[in-house]
Regions:
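RNA-binding accessory domains that recognize and position tRNA/RNA substrates
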Residues: 1-178, 182-208
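Conserved small/polar residues in nucleotide/adenosyl-binding loops
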Residues: 212-219
């Protein structure tokens, strides 16, 4: 494992080791306090462009499930069809994993998806810094390489457009009630929960200029 340093925009540094795809990266540093579910968190579109810090101390011990899909097109075990987080930052990465449904290790998955991962970080201390300072940018740099990547600048980046569906998608067609879902980065499990409640879900892109409800006969409201 190569030595890496997480450098926050206020100059604070945390030193660790690389276990994912080896490339420097910059982005907004955010924390996640979930005790499990790192495959779901990494594939959550709401984390697009962010360096995700996991506060739970041990990560990777149950591997990564396969990318399979349900008949309705939703991923079975993930929240979308790929990793959206720009990097993952953990305290202790377990190279050994064991789970009946595991297909590969977290490191193998990260490398395949070109996503950096670093371990050996005091993530709880890092979380305290982020909690007190608020939104903060950061970089993951390799100690044996010069810092040649710019600070993350999200001005002009439309993340909603990047994660939203491009076409209208229907789930559970013909159900008794219908829900229109404007996709600004929806997780698969939100759609699944709606389907399980017996409704048809019409998933539409985010980029409507206006949603207009026309007049109707009588008191249809």
């Amino acid at each position: 494992m190569r030595n890496v340093t997480l450098v926050l925009s206020d100059g604070t540094k945390f030193h660790g080791k690389s276990f994912g795809y080896e490339k420097p990266v910059a982005g907004e540093v955010v924390f996640n306090t979930a005790m499990m579910g790192y495959p779901e968190s990494l594939t959550d579109p709401s984390y697009a462009g962010q360096l995700m810090v996991l506060t739970f101390p041990l990560v990777g011990n149950y591997g990564v499930p396969p990318f399979s899909f349900e008949p309705n097109g939703l991923p079975t075990f993930m929240e979308s069809d790929r990793i959206y987080a720009s990097a993952i930052i953990v305290a202790d990465y377990s190279e050994q994993y064991s789970h009946w449904n595991a297909k590969e290790s977290l490191a193998e998955w990260l490398k395949r998806e070109h996503v950096p991962g670093i371990t050996g970080i005091d993530t709880r201390e890092l979380t305290k810094v982020l909690r007190e300072a608020g939104v903060m940018m950061g970089k993951i740099l390799f100690d044996d390489e010069p810092d040649n990547i710019p600070e993350a600048n999200y001005e002009g980046v439309n993340f909603v457009d990047l994660v939203s569906c491009k076409d209208i998608i229907k789930y559970n067609e013909g159900a008794g009630k219908r829900v229109v879902l404007v996709d600004c980065g929806v997780k698969a499990n939100i759609i699944r929960c709606l389907i399980n409640r017996g409704v048809e879900v019409v998933r539409v892109p985010w980029n409507y200029c206006l949603l207009y409800t026309s007049p109707s006969p009588r008191d249809s409201a």
